[in-house]
Structure formats: C-alpha cells, structure tokens
C-alpha cells in the first residue's frame, strides 16, 4: 500500500526507486513529449534540485538495450504500447552526470572528467572482444578504460573525442545509433570560473560536445540538463539542430518539479493533507512556462520529516544544499536603486526586468543586470507574467527563498554597520547614558542606509521581531555588556535587558511597531508604561542593579522614535 512506501530522499536513480519500493511521482510523460517534439540535441535548463538527474536516469532505463522493462509497469508511459514497442530498450545509451567534475586546477577537473567517461565506458566491457569491431576499434575501447598506477590513463588528446568514440563503438556493436544523456553539463564551467581556469574548460567542453553532438553520425539524439543556458557561441558553436527548453518555455513545463495535484496526492498518501497550505507557502511558487510547480527536493524532505513529527515546522531544505553566493554577490553589488527594488521583492512586490537567458559564466558578475538574469534562471526569482515590451515580472517564489534573501541581507547589514566602529562606540555610549536623541539619530541613519527586511509582509508581531533582532545585534556587539532577549521578568517578558559594564546600571528596552509615523510617539509611551506596569525592572533590582534606564522605541518602516526615562 502507498502508506508503506518509503520516500526517496536524495535518491536519483530511477531503477533503485522502482525496485526498492519508493514513492515515485510519475514523470514518464516526459518520454512521450521528448519523442513527439523531436530534437536532435535537447537542452533543459532548470534550477538545482528539480528532478533533472532522476528524469535523465528514467530516460536511460527506458531507452537502453537490456534495461528492465518492468520498471515502467503501471506508469503512464506503459499505456502507450505502440511507442514502447518502437523505442523501449532499443538503443545503446551513454549517461554521464557532470555534477562532480571540479577541481582547484584544470588538471584536477580534467582528470575528474576522464574518470567519469572511463567509468561509463567500463559498463560496456564487452566491446573489448566485440566481433562487430575491428582490432583497432577494440584497442581504442581499451584506451578509454586503461589504468596505469591506479589512475585512468585516458590521454588528454583523446579526452575531447572520447564521447564520440564511445558512441561510435556502441553503434557499431549494436547496429543502432546511440543516445547521449549529459546531466549538469554546466557544472564544470561554473567550477572552472570559480577557480580560474574557465577558458581551458570552455575549450575542452566545446571540443567534446562539438564532436559528440555536431558531427556525430552515430548519434540518435542527445539530452542535456543544467542550470544555465550557456551562450551558444561559447559552447555550442555550429549546433544548428539545437533545441533549448528553458524555464520560460511551456513545453515540458510540468516535467521538472511537482504540480499542485502531485503534491496533494503525495500528502494524501501519508495522511498529511492538512499540511498543504504550509507546503505551498514554503515550497511552491516557481513558474515554468505555463505551470506553477513546487521544488521536489523540499516537498520530499518536508513530508519525510512530517511522517515522524506531524507538528514539525517547514525548513529550508533547498537552501541547505545550494550555495547562496549569488544572492550575497547581488546584495554586495546593489546600488541604491537596486536596494530599493530588493526591498520591494522581499515585501512581496514584483519587479519588471528584461532577462538574458543566454550568458557565459564570465559575464555573470560583470553587471547587476546579468545577476538579475542569473537569479531568475537559478530559482532565486521566478516570474508571474510578461509586459508588452517583453520584461518579466519577477517575484521571490516562496517563503523558503525569501528567508535566503533576509538572511543574506542581515549578514550584509551587520558587516556594513560593524565596519564603522567609531559610530558604534558613540551609539553604545549614548545608549548607556540615556541620550535618546543620539540613539534615535543613529538608528534612523542605520535604517535609512539598510535594505529593509523590517517591513516585509506579515503580522505586526513579525515586523516587531525583525526590528528586535536588529537592535539585539547592535547591542550584543558591545563585548562587555550582557544582552538578554525576551527575558522573563516581573509579571511578563521584557523585550531586551542589558547589564552594562557598570555593576550598578541596567537598561530595559520595549519595542513597538507603529502603523504610521504619527503613531510612533504614542507607541513609545505605551512601551514605557508596559515596562512599569509589568515591573520588568525587578529582574535588574534582584541582581543588585539599582540604576535602571528605560527605553520605549517605536519603529515604522525605516524610521524610529526613541524615548528614554530613568526609573
């Protein structure tokens, strides 16, 4: 029964999922669409963790000669008997995932690629004695898998043609053209750019793909997946039969990621339908073509946790497996205009931008406009429509990704504020003395120069908490002060209590969020009255601190009002 099915957390092999009884969201319609919309070379670009590798594995097991046809029993593709009879198990298949092709040097990465191709070639050990091959061809195969001193010995000059050669040998053995599947094709380029050997890797990948995909008479068709559509002039020069299916294309728009119906069915299978709303808020919102989809990695992980703990809160699963360097770079490069746009995004608004879907890695950080494009293609932004002049209406897709931006903005903000030690020292001195005017001036200047996450969509309590975190961070930077947050004191919980380096002194802070600027004064008075009524000062008095300073601070957007009193 469905209830007994395990969830495939981190499993990307189609056969393992089907044979070991894991829950599988049926994406086999992808096969039918691929054959109906025929393309000699097909590139699918999607963000990471959207099921690209699993779909490629599925293609391998469907088309490959000798694969277990029963893996597809009961799945949608099995209903198309004519297609299955014509294509299933009829082709040799080369399947490579480039996700681990990396290294600090070009030589390291080059060997990882050679290792990958040699490992795939070893699956076809029968080629070494195939009577369909000449002795020279058998020798060429042995060259692909040769090992010397514990390392694959694939020569550098052979590496460029290795894919084409393997497809030729397989085709001659089987009397059938070869299908080539290349997963995460752009990872080697990304890693090369990060480590300073981009030109060398571009040359290698361009040569390899050119021979395997452009002038290869032994190719049936090829499918590539990746995050970025790398410029055709950079990698895919001369590929006239090249079809790109990006996140803006309505073809295959439901084949990567989970649809609403698929998520509802998954939750129902584990009696978790009451978690649909939170799952949607955190992990839905990606727009691929005409489809709205969820990140499958997030959904699978969330449901897996909920099975053992139904009260578990959503977590940022995708964030934890993907670097957020792009968002960090974007924030650091942002000018005042871009920071304003970023604030609007975090607040839930849409920003209109023209997007370049085709870039080279060395162009990514050359302009802020290019970064907008990369954030869109990698899933940190999505679109909810296109203007008449072709600009995309960009939004943050969901709560999980909003948390990425908020975290990176807060890190940037903290770094920026703490860089000005003189201003900070003045703020701390004014705060300890009860100089409300100086404290207010510092906070207003700080807020005006920030990227606001302090007024994003949410309840007043949530907004107040954002300002609370800001102030705690500023005060905690004073090493010889003890700063406590949400402290049980008197007849309630004080927002912030500070025990300064003067053993007789202490400070109590109560924060309020005001709906309007004019309401801030009353909010400050309300905060001070709450401190007195709830007797928060008892906490400090009990610790021998008799000189107590009270602060009522009200925030509204990027402004604040500060009132101080001595108890």
Residues covered by each model-derived region:
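Sensor-1/coupling segment of RecA-like P-loop NTPase cores
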Residues: 187, 197-238
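P-loop NTPase motor core
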Residues: 10, 61-126
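Conserved P-loop NTPase mechanochemical-coupling segment
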Residues: 9-18, 108, 112-160, 188-193
């Amino acid at each position: 029964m469905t209830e007994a099915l395990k969830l495939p957390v981190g499993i990307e092999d189609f056969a393992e999922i089907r044979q070991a009884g894991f829950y599988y969201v049926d994406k086999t319609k992808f096969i039918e669409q691929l054959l109906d919309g025929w393309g000699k070379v097909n590139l699918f670009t999607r963000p990471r963790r959207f099921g690209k590798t699993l779909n490629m594995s599925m293609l391998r097991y469907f088309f490959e000669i000798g694969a277990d046809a029963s893996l597809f029993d009961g799945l949608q593709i099995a209903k198309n008997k004519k297609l299955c009879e014509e294509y299933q198990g009829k082709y040799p298949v080369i399947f490579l995932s480039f996700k681990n092709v990396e290294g600090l040097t070009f030589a390291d990465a080059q060997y990882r690629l050679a290792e990958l191709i040699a490992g795939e070639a070893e699956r076809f050990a029968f080629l070494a004695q195939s009577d369909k091959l000449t002795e020279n061809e058998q020798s060429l195969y042995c060259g692909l898998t040769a090992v010397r001193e514990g390392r694959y010995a694939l020569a550098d000059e052979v590496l460029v043609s290795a894919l084409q050669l393997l497809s030729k040998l397989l085709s001659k053995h089987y009397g059938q053209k070869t299908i080539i599947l290349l997963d995460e094709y752009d990872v080697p380029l990304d890693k090369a750019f990060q480590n300073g050997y981009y030109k060398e890797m571009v040359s290698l990948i361009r040569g390899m793909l050119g021979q395997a995909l452009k002038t290869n008479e032994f190719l049936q068709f090829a499918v590539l997946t990746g995050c970025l559509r790398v410029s055709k002039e950079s990698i895919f020069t001369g590929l006239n039969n090249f079809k790109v299916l990006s996140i803006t294309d309505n073809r295959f728009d439901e084949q990567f990621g989970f649809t609403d119906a698929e998520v509802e069915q998954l939750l129902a299978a584990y009696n978790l339908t009451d978690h649909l709303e939170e799952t949607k808020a955190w992990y839905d919102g990606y727009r691929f073509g005409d489809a709205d989809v969820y990140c499958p990695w997030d959904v699978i992980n969330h449901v897996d946790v909920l099975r053992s703990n139904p009260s578990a809160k959503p977590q940022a699963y995708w964030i934890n497996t993907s670097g957020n360097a792009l968002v960090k770079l974007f924030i650091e490069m942002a000018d005042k205009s871009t920071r304003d746009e970023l604030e609007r995004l975090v607040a839930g608004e849409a920003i209109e931008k023209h997007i370049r879907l085709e870039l080279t890695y060395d162009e990514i950080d050359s302009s802020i406009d290019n970064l907008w494009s990369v954030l869109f293609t990698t899933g940190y932004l999505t679109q909810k429509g296109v203007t008449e002049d072709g600009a995309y209406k960009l939004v943050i897709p969901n709560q999980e990704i909003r948390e990425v931006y908020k975290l990176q903005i807060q890190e940037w903000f903290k770094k920026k504020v703490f860089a000005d030690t003189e201003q900070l020292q003045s703020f701390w001195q004014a705060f300890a003395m009860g100089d409300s005017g100086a404290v207010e001036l510092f906070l207003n200047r700080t807020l005006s120069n920030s990227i606001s996450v302090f007024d994003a969509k949410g309840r007043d309590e949530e907004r107040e908490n954002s300002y609370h975190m800001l102030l705690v961070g500023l005060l905690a930077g004073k090493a010889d002060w003890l700063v406590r947050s949400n402290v049980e004191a008197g007849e309630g919980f004080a927002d912030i209590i500070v025990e300064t380096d003067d053993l007789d002194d202490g400070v109590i802070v109560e924060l309020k969020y005001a709906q309007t600027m004019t309401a801030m004064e009353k909010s400050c008075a309300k905060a001070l009255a709450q401190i007195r009524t709830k007797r928060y000062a008892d906490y400090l008095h009990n610790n021998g601190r008799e000189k107590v300073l009270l602060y009522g601070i009200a925030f509204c957007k990027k402004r604040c009002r500060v009132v101080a009193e001595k108890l």
